[in-house]
Amino acid sequence: MNADAEGHSGAVVPAQSPEGSSAADDFVPSALGTREHWDAVYERELRTFQEYGDTGEIWFGEESMNRLIRWMQKHKIPLDASVLDIGTGNGVFLVELVKHGFSNITGIDYSPSAIKLSASILEKEGLSNINLKVEDFLNPSTKLSGFHVCVDKGTYDAISLNPDNAIEKRKQYVMSLSRVLEVKGFFLITSCNWTKAELLDAFSEGFELFEELPTPKFSFGGRSGNTVAALVFQKRGTSLDKIS
């Protein structure tokens, strides 16, 4: 049930455009952007895990997780830095973070079934020191704050497909990110629905591009592009403090 090694898990229809074109005007509202859809998905995956031990899909594949962890190691993100996984789903990325030594990890999802699934998988792995919370990232609790690193692998994509005013929800996402991420903190996003240029525009208020991560390329009809966009943003601010 896992996704391919790179690219797409099958949960969100890819809308990456070749260079020079935009997918922003091509989105069609979809049930894939609704809470009801994801509740149903994770209720089904929870039953499957309980019956067969199958953890479910790995969002964008294992390589997407490895890419993010390699970046964190390359830039010497402290192992005790606070990390937030936005839309954690089955929590498999949380498991990988722990395996690589990270110890201050929080996973959130607005689907209670997703959090139940994550908790079951973490219990099977013998992990009890990870924070799991049912949280709507568009309306986060006041306790959700002060993170050094925030990670998104598909949640912003899903929000973009919401039938109920997706444009405003994307703006609210950026506001929420600004609230929960510390000044000079890092935001790592992987998207199949948005190009680099579109993500730069979406997160231009309060964030700056720190690095673009390499992802597989494709070519079609003489034009080229990436199967996914993977970017690292840093939150702007006046503080000169680094993660410590």
Swiss-Prot record:
Major localisation: cytoplasm
CDD domains: AdoMet_MTases (cd02440)
Residues found modified as Phosphoserine: S21
GO MF annotation: an example: protein-lysine N-methyltransferase activity
Catalytic function, reaction form: L-lysyl-[protein] + 3 S-adenosyl-L-methionine = N(6),N(6),N(6)-trimethyl-L-lysyl-[protein] + 3 S-adenosyl-L-homocysteine + 3 H(+)
Keyword Methyltransferase: yes
Source organism, top-level taxon: Eukaryota
Top class in the EC scheme: transferase
Keyword S-adenosyl-L-methionine among record annotations: yes
GO cellular component, one term: cytoplasm
GO biological process, one term: peptidyl-lysine methylation
Keywords from the named record: Cytoplasm, Methyltransferase, Nucleus, Phosphoprotein, S-adenosyl-L-methionine, Transferase
SUPFAM superfamilies per UniProt: S-adenosyl-L-methionine-dependent methyltransferases (SSF53335)
Pfam families linked: Methyltransf_31
Compartments where found: Cytoplasm; Nucleus
E.C. numbers: 2.1.1.-
Region (Disordered): 1-27
Function: Protein-lysine methyltransferase that selectively catalyzes the trimethylation of EEF1A at 'Lys-318'.
Entry similarity comment: Belongs to the class I-like SAM-binding methyltransferase superfamily. EFM4 family.
Protein name: EEF1A lysine methyltransferase 2
Record organism: Mus musculus
Taxonomic classification: Eukaryota, Metazoa, Chordata, Craniata, Vertebrata
